[in-house]
Amino acid sequence: MTKLSTPYIDTELYSRILIKPQQINNDIYINLKNNLKKKVEKKCNKYGFITKIYKILDFSEGEVVPENFDSSVVFNIKFSCRICLPVTDTNIICKIDLLNKSLIKASNGPIVCIIGINYINKDNFSINNKGDIIDNNTNEVIKANDYIVVNIKGTNFFPGDERIVILGGLQSIPSNEKIESYYKENLEIEKIVEDEPSDIDNLSNDNSSEISDVENDNYLNL
């Protein structure tokens, strides 16, 4: 039985966020989060693709950069989020977008999977004289919108990309129960409470100095 892995994890990251002078008001937390979402959400950084920002966990006292003539303030931010990071030699479920006689293109969220016709598990699949891929267990032709189990052979993404491209191998066809369970698990890895109006009161200035001690390499300078 093929073991499945999820490419999605909940984690904590750091970033540096710029706030305009007109955003320095009682809604500072909301403005910080909105600016953070615009900067890092729905795009890749060196850790993977950030699918969702949950909440800001802590932020430093603002710093006015002398070289910045519009008087914007820079904050060091610690935040919780969900990232997508496919790992080589693991198996995930993808949905076929298109296929032809030379390759299969499938997807899972921000993941775009390319499968060459030579990377098919010959124990589970065969190719007929028309070039169609046949599931040996059901004798049915694989077609667009089918769900497949993909073994990840390699990944490719760069900071700022809006997708992650993977090279994969076609392993098997998952059951309906596995598909439902897999996608439900991906959506419910960990329940994280979304921001409440009182969250800003819980971020005390006593903790803000701790963020400034984090090494610069942990910050997302996109």
Task: Label every PLM stretch briefly.
Residues 1-222:
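Single-stranded RNA-binding regions, centering on S1/OB-family and related RNA-binding modules
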